[in-house]
Amino acid sequence: MNFQLQPTLTGKLVQLRPLQPADFDELFAAASDPLIWEQHPESTRYKKEVFQIYFDSAIESKGAFAVIDRKSGKIIGSSRYWNLKPLESEVEIGWTFLQRAYWGGEYNREMKQLMLDHAFTFVERVVFVVGENNLRSQKAMQKIGGRFWKKEPRPGPGSNQMNVFFVITR
């Protein structure tokens, strides 16, 4: 399988391109609103030192995207492919956020559809992992056709939070 984790994907509203180290300041500006993270398991990700960990992990993953509003040319969020499992014909899409001005409309739907269309040229199943208390993201998963799959404890020492898994199949 030759799954390209960071292609450039272009729709009417957004372009997804590989996230670069030089994107930190603009992406942090997009992420610095505490309300973006209020239901997220990492609720302090709006703080620069916490966001730096997220950003470094995104760069290291070699599957992260900068999400760009095609009208303004500005970075409005990020998402990534993660946890590619060729034997199971599966990949995860996650670590996604958008600025609040882009919530509730077509931006998330188009971003995810671009990623799904690309993924389904290589795999049969796409998995999304959402924090149990992140009801906003769970509703967004349902809007794009995600089906509840399972619930598991969130990994990490001392974590008592649960993750909810959604799946979309080709």
Predicted regions and their residues:
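A short helix-loop-beta-strand connector motif used in the catalytic cores of GNAT acetyltransferases and
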Residues: F55-A66
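Conserved beta-strand in the GNAT
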Residues: A66, K74-N83, E92
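Conserved acetyl-CoA-binding loop-helix of GNAT-fold acetyltransferases
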Residues: G104-H118, K139, K143
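Conserved GNAT acetyl-CoA-binding A-motif
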Residues: T121-V130
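Conserved catalytic-core motifs of GNAT/GCN5-like acyltransferases
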Residues: V129, R147-N163
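Conserved active-site alpha-helix within GNAT-family acetyltransferase domains
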Residues: N133-K150
